[in-house]
Design a protein with these regions (language model features):
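Histidine/acidic-residue-rich, glycine-tolerant segments that coordinate divalent metal ions
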Residues: 1-116, 198-199
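Metal-dependent amide/peptide-bond hydrolase catalytic core
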Residues: 78-257
C-alpha cells in the first residue's frame, strides 16, 4: 500500500543482506496447481516485473440527456482501455516474452443520468524484459493523452515501479539442480515456463544471486484445484515438508561447495 515499504525492499534497506554478508539466496512459493511432492523451476527470468499506473481523465460534466454539451470521460476511458490493449496485441513482440496491461479499477460518475467531469483508472503492467517494459511505458505515455485529446478531453498517466523481474541465476540453478533431484527425486523436479505474477523476492536477486522455485501443494489424487487469490484456494499442508527439506539441503550444499 502507498506509504508502506514492507517486504524485501525494507529488509534490504535495514541491512538484512549485510553483517554477515549474504552470498546467495533461496526462496520458494507454494503452488496450489502443482502436485504435492513436485518442484517446478525455471532458469533466468521466472516471474514478471510489476508496475502500477494511474490514469486521470478530465472531461466536461453535462446532463446525460444532452451529451453534446459536455465531454464524456467514461467514453474516453473506454477508448483508452481499448487502445492500451493494442500495445500488447499489435506492438509487443510476444514471441520473445509475455507482457500484460490490465486496468483493474475504474472510478467515475455521480448519478445515473449525469455525464461526469472526470474518471480515474488504476492498473498493472507485467513484463519479463526491461527493454520491453521501457517500450510499453513509452507507448502508454504517448497514447493516453493523445486518445483523450481526440475526444476533446485531457488525460494524464503516472507509472510507478513495483517489483523487479524475478531472475534465477543460471549458474546457481545448475549448482542446485542435483540437490533438488536428490531430495525430491529426479522425476519430481520439473521445468516450467515464466509466469506473469510478480514477487518482491526479486529485490534480493538484484543484490545477490538467487534461486526461487515453486513447491507443489495440490493434494494427491486431485487433478484440478483453484488458483491462488480466489475464494476457494486450498493447499495440502503435507507438501510443506518437502519445501523445508529442499531449502535446508540447498543451504548445506551451497555452504559445502
Amino acid at each position: 500500500p502507498e506509504g508502506e515499504e514492507g517486504g524485501a525492499a525494507l529488509m534490504i534497506k535495514e541491512g538484512v543482506l549485510e553483517n554477515p554478508k549474504v552470498d546467495a539466496i533461496f526462496g520458494l512459493h507454494i503452488n496450489s496447481q502443482t502436485p504435492v511432492g513436485v518442484i517446478r523451476y525455471k532458469s533466468g527470468g521466472t516471474m514478471a516485473s510489476s508496475q502500477r499506473f494511474v490514469i486521470n481523465v478530465i472531461g466536461k460534466q453535462t446532463h446525460g440527456s444532452q451529451p453534446w454539451g459536455g465531454v464524456d470521460p467514461i467514453l474516453i476511458s473506454a477508448k483508452i482501455i481499448d487502445g492500451l490493449q493494442t500495445i500488447i496485441s499489435r506492438e509487443t513482440k510476444l514471441i520473445d516474452e509475455p507482457a500484460v496491461i490490465t486496468v483493474g479499477k475504474i472510478t467515475s460518475g455521480v448519478r445515473f443520468n449525469i455525464i461526469p467531469e472526470s474518471a480515474e483508472m488504476i492498473g498493472t503492467i507485467r513484463t519479463l524484459d526491461y527493454d520491453m517494459q521501457k517500450f510499453i511505458n513509452q507507448r502508454m505515455m504517448e497514447m493516453v493523452p493523445a486518445i483523450a485529446k481526440a475526444f476533446r478531453g485531457e488525460a494524464t498517466i503516472t507509472i510507478n515501479n513495483g517489483t523487479a523481474i524475478t531472475y534465477n541465476d543460471p549458474d546457481l540453478v545448475t549448482q542446485m539442480l542435483p540437490t533438488m533431484e536428490r531430495v525430491a527425486g529426479a522425476a519430481n523436479v520439473q521445468t516450467q515456463k515464466a509466469i506473469t505474477g510478480a514477487e518482491d523476492f526479486s529485490f534480493f536477486q538484484e543484490k545477490v544471486p538467487g534461486f526461487y522455485f515453486f513447491l507443489g501443494g495440490m493434494a494427491p489424487g486431485t487433478t484440478e484445484s483453484y488458483p491462488h487469490h480466489t475464494p476457494d484456494f486450498l493447499i495440502d499442508d503435507s507438501g510443506l515438508l518437502l519445501g523445508v527439506k529442499t531449502l535446508t539441503e540447498m543451504s548445506l550444499d551451497y555452504l559445502a561447495k
